[in-house]
Amino acid sequence: METKFNFKSQICTSREQSERLLALGLKKETADMCWMYGEVLSCNPPELTVDIPAWSLHRLIEMMPEEMYGGLLCIFKDSIRYEEMLMDRLEAHFEVVGDNMYENAISCIEWLIKEGYFNKKYLCEK
C-alpha cells in the first residue's frame, strides 16, 4: 500500500516576503536562495539584477542574535520570542505568534532592526 503525502511546506521566503526584507534594508547577499526570472526557485544566491533574493528559515534565524540584554532567543513551532529568566518568572522582551514561521521571523527581524539589535553587517549602508 502506497502512502501519498501532500506536503505544502514553505522552503524559502515568498517574493512578497523577500521584497519586505529588502525594504527593511537586508543585503541581498545575505540570501541563500533566489527566485530567478520566470518564477523558478534556485538554491543559489542571486546573481542577476532580475533575480529576487530568497531566504530559508534557517538563514533568517541564523541572522538573529542568540541573546540580547539578558534575553535568549526562543523558537517554538508557532512563535519566536526573546525571553529572560528572572527570579520568579519569565520576562518576554518580544514575542510574535502565528501560523507562518516565515512571517514570524520577518516580524522579529523588523523589530530587531527597529530596536537596534540586528547585526548591521547584514544591512545595507544608509
How should each PLM-predicted stretch be described?
Residues M1-K126:
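Glycine-rich anion-binding surface patch
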